[in-house]
C-alpha cells in the first residue's frame, strides 16, 4: 500500500499527515494497523476522524471477494471476440482474438509472423471497424503490403483509406521506446487520442524478441526486470483496458534437448494466454505460401491442434475471389 499523502482520500489533510509522520505513521498499512485511540491521544487528533479515515482507506485499498456468478457476468459484458480474418487461425483461437488476453505468434525467420499480424490488423480495421495500434520493432511493416491486403477485401478506395486511418503505426526499436509507447497509450486511452473515433481495440507488437533479447544473458542483470515490466504493461492494456494484445516471438533451440522452443525463456512463457506456433510445411520451403499453425498454449482448448494457412494468397486476386464467393 502507498504512502500517506494529500489527495489520497477525502479528509486526509497536510496537517494530519505531518502529525502522523511525527509518530512514525507514514503509510496506509501503518495507519490501518495502529491503535487509533493511542494515535488520537499522541497526535492530538479526533478519534472519530481517524476511524472514518481508516474506513475510507480500507474501502479504497482492500481486496473484496467476488462470487463466481458475478465474475462470469462481468466477463460476458467486458469480453469481445475479434476475428483475425483467417478462418483456420480463428479455429485455433476459439473464434478469434479475445479482449483481455495476450496472444503470441511464435515462429522462425520467414515463418509468416508479420504477415499474420498485418492480416489481423487489416481485418480488424476494415471488417470490424476497430482501431489498431501496430508497434513495429523490426522494420517488417510496409504500408504497401497493408494496402494490398485491404484491396483484396474491398475495391472502394474510400473504405481502404478509412481502414488505413484506423491503424496507428509506431516504430520502437528498443525496450525504452516500446515502454514509452505502451505507457502513453495506457495513460491516454480514455481520451480517445487515436486518429479515428473510439479507443484502440487491438495492440500488435511485432516483435518483442527484437527489443528484449539484446538485454538478456551475460552480465546485463536488468534485462529480466525490463522484460517483466514490458509484460506488465501488455497485461495491463489487455486486462484493465479491455484490449486484445498480439505479440510475435522468435524460436530458439534448447541447449540440452536440441528441440526448438519459444525464445525469451520460462519467465516470459507465463505472459501469453494463447500461443500459436507457425512453421513452414516440409517441402514447401520458406518461399512457399503454406504454413502450419499449431496451438501450443491455450486456456480454452486442448493444445496440439494444427491448421494449415496459406499466406501466399493473402492480398491476391485469389483471396479476393474467395472473399466474394463467401459473400454470395
Curated annotation (Swiss-Prot):
A molecular function (GO) term: ATP-dependent activity, acting on DNA
Expressed in which tissues: Expressed in colon, prostate, spleen, testis, ovary, thymus and small intestine. Weakly expressed in leukocytes.
Task performed by this protein: Involved in the homologous recombination repair (HRR) pathway of double-stranded DNA breaks arising during DNA replication or induced by DNA-damaging agents. Bind to single-stranded DNA (ssDNA) and has DNA-dependent ATPase activity. Part of the RAD51 paralog protein complex BCDX2 which acts in the BRCA1-BRCA2-dependent HR pathway. Upon DNA damage, BCDX2 acts downstream of BRCA2 recruitment and upstream of RAD51 recruitment. BCDX2 binds predominantly to the intersection of the four duplex arms of the Holliday junction and to junction of replication forks.
Assigned keywords, A-Z: ATP-binding, Chromosome, Cytoplasm, Cytoskeleton, DNA damage, DNA recombination, DNA repair, DNA-binding, Nucleotide-binding, Nucleus, Telomere
Region of interest (preferentially binds ssDNA), ranges: 1-83
Coiled-coil residue spans: none
Organism: Homo sapiens
SUPFAM superfamilies registered for this protein in UniProt: P-loop containing nucleoside triphosphate hydrolases
Binding-site residues for ATP, renumbered to this chain: 107-114
Residues spanning the membrane: none
Broad class of where this protein is predominantly found: nucleus
Noted disease: Breast-ovarian cancer, familial, 4: A condition associated with familial predisposition to cancer of the breast and ovaries. Characteristic features in affected families are an early age of onset of breast cancer (often before age 50), increased chance of bilateral cancers (cancer that develop in both breasts, or both ovaries, independently), frequent occurrence of breast cancer among men, increased incidence of tumors of other specific organs, such as the prostate.
Lineage of source species: Eukaryota, Metazoa, Chordata, Craniata, Vertebrata
GO CC aspect terms: centrosome; chromosome, telomeric region; cytoplasm; microtubule organizing center; nucleoplasm; nucleus; Rad51B-Rad51C-Rad51D-XRCC2 complex; replication fork
Similarity comment: family membership: Belongs to the RecA family. RAD51 subfamily.
Protein's recorded name: DNA repair protein RAD51 homolog 4
Biological process annotations from GO: DNA repair; DNA strand invasion; double-strand break repair via homologous recombination; interstrand cross-link repair; reciprocal meiotic recombination; regulation of cell cycle; telomere maintenance; telomere maintenance via recombination
Record PANTHER family: DNA REPAIR PROTEIN RAD51 HOMOLOG 4
InterPro entries found in the cross-reference section: AAA+_ATPase (IPR003593), DNA_recomb/repair_Rad51_C (IPR013632), DNA_recomb/repair_RecA-like (IPR016467), HRR_RAD51_Paralog (IPR051988), P-loop_NTPase (IPR027417), Rad51D_C (IPR047323), RAD51D_N (IPR048943), RecA_ATP-bd (IPR020588)
Subunit record text: Part of the BCDX2 complex consisting of RAD51B, RAD51C, RAD51D and XRCC2; the complex has a ring-like structure arranged into a flat disc around a central channel. In the absence of DNA, the BCDX2 subcomplex XRCC2:RAD51D formed a multimeric ring structure; in the presence of single-stranded DNA it formed a filamentous structure with the ssDNA. Interacts with SWSAP1 and ZSWIM7; involved in homologous recombination repair. Interacts with BLM; required for stimulation of BLM activity by the BCDX2 subcomplex XRCC2:RAD51D.
Localization (cell): Nucleus; Cytoplasm, Cytoskeleton, Microtubule organizing center, Centrosome; Chromosome, Telomere
Amino acid at each position: 500500500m502507498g504512502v500517506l499523502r494529500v489527495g489520497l482520500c477525502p479528509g486526509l489533510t497536510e496537517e494530519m499527515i505531518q502529525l502522523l509522520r511525527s509518530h512514525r505513521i507514514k503509510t496506509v498499512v501503518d495507519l490501518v494497523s495502529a491503535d487509533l485511540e493511542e494515535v488520537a491521544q499522541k497526535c492530538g487528533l479526533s478519534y472519530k476522524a481517524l476511524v472514518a479515515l481508516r474506513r475510507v482507506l480500507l474501502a479504497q485499498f482492500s481486496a473484496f471477494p467476488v462470487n463466481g456468478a458475478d465474475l462470469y457476468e462481468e466477463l460476458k459484458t467486458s469480453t469481445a471476440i475479434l476475428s483475425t480474418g483467417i478462418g483456420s487461425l480463428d479455429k485455433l483461437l476459439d473464434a478469434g482474438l479475445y479482449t483481455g488476453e495476450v496472444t503470441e505468434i511464435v515462429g522462425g525467420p520467414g515463418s509468416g509472423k508479420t504477415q499474420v499480424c498485418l492480416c489481423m490488423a487489416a481485418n480488424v480495421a476494415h471488417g470490424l471497424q476497430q482501431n489498431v495500434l501496430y508497434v513495429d520493432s523490426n522494420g517488417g511493416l510496409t504500408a504497401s503490403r497493408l494496402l494490398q491486403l485491404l484491396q483484396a477485401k474491398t475495391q472502394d478506395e474510400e473504405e481502404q483509406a478509412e481502414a488505413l486511418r484506423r491503424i496507428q503505426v509506431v516504430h520502437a526499436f528498443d525496450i525504452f521506446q516500446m515502454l514509452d509507447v505502451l505507457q502513453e497509450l495506457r495513460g491516454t486511452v480514455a481520451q480517445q487520442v487515436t486518429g479515428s473515433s473510439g479507443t484502440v481495440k487491438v495492440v500488435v507488437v511485432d516483435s518483442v524478441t527484437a527489443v528484449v533479447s539484446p538485454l538478456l544473458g551475460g552480465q546485463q542483470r536488468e534485462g529480466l526486470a525490463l522484460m517483466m515490466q514490458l509484460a506488465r504493461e501488455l497485461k495491463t492494456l489487455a486486462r484493465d483496458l479491455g484490449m486484445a494484445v498480439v505479440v510475435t516471438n522468435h524460436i530458439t533451440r534448447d541447449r540440452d534437448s536440441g528441440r526448438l522452443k519459444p525464445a525469451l525463456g520460462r519467465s516470459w512463457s507465463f505472459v501469453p494466454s494463447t500461443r500459436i506456433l507457425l512453421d513452414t510445411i516440409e517441402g514447401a520451403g520458406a518461399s512457399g505460401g503454406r504454413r502450419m499453425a499449431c496451438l501450443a498454449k491455450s486456456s480454452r482448448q486442448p493444445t496440439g491442434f494444427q491448421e494449415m494457412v496459406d499466406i501466399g494468397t493473402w492480398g491476391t486476386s485469389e483471396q479476393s475471389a474467395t472473399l466474394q464467393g463467401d459473400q454470395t
